């Protein structure tokens, strides 16, 4: 039995139902295609039906040998459960910068603190929309943040991260057949492709950082 099928103690609900209920109490930042804020949207509404375009980020942390740290989404996740992602991905909340949101998720999900990496840089931003089975969708303007880890130790939270591994970034892009057992999240695949194919759109310092 997977974690997604197990009930939380005393609740009678599965972990996935708990996550859905939690999402229903949270908001994301609705945005234009240019990432200009238009208001707030309920997080569950933003990921069901036709969805709502909203602000998001994905972070890629590298070691000094050019390997990227991939994290597997826990099986309790409603969307892209057990798929492999970049290091972390999520949504900033109202009033929170992309950099601060990224630092928070790195600490919460992987126990990685700011002193372990150099400056987080926003290297790209793109819009995408993808559906996942009959569970929902992502419709995001996604910022890409990158940094190099000088201290590569981490301590993953199993409620959020099912597994983690270091992978040669260039090899993953150029030889995907070698990694076909890894189901990759679409936003990570897009970010990686844009990185290598020269489509990345550098973001000026301080612009919605």
Segments and roles (model prediction):
Residues 52, 77, 81, 85, ...:
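Hydrophobic alpha-helical segments and helix-packing faces
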Residues 69-70, 85-123:
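The catalytic Nudix box helix
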Residues 3-58, 62-64:
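Acidic, metal-coordinating catalytic segment for phosphate/diphosphate chemistry
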């Amino acid at each position: 039995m997977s974690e997604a099928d197990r009930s939380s103690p005393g609740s009678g609900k599965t972990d996935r139902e708990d996550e859905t209920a939690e999402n229903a109490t949270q908001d994301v930042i609705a945005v234009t295609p240019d990432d200009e804020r238009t208001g707030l949207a309920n997080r569950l509404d933003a990921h069901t039906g036709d969805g709502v375009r909203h602000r998001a980020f994905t972070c890629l942390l590298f070691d000094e040998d050019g390997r990227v740290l991939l994290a597997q989404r826990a099986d309790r996740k409603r969307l892209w459960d057990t798929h492999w992602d970049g290091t972390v991905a999520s949504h900033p909340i109202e009033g929170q910068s992309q950099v601060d949101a990224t630092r928070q998720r790195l600490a919460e999900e992987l126990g990685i603190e700011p002193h372990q990496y150099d400056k987080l840089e926003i290297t790209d931003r793109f819009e995408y929309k993808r559906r996942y089975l009959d569970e929902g969708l992502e419709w995001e303007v996604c910022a890409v943040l990158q940094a190099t880890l000088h201290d590569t130790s981490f301590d993953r939270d199993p409620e959020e991260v099912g597994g983690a591994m270091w992978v040669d970034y260039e090899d993953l892009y150029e030889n995907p057949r070698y990694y076909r057992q890894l189901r990759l999240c679409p936003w990570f695949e897009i970010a990686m492709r844009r990185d290598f194919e020269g489509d990345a759109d550098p973001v000026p310092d301080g612009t919605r950082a």
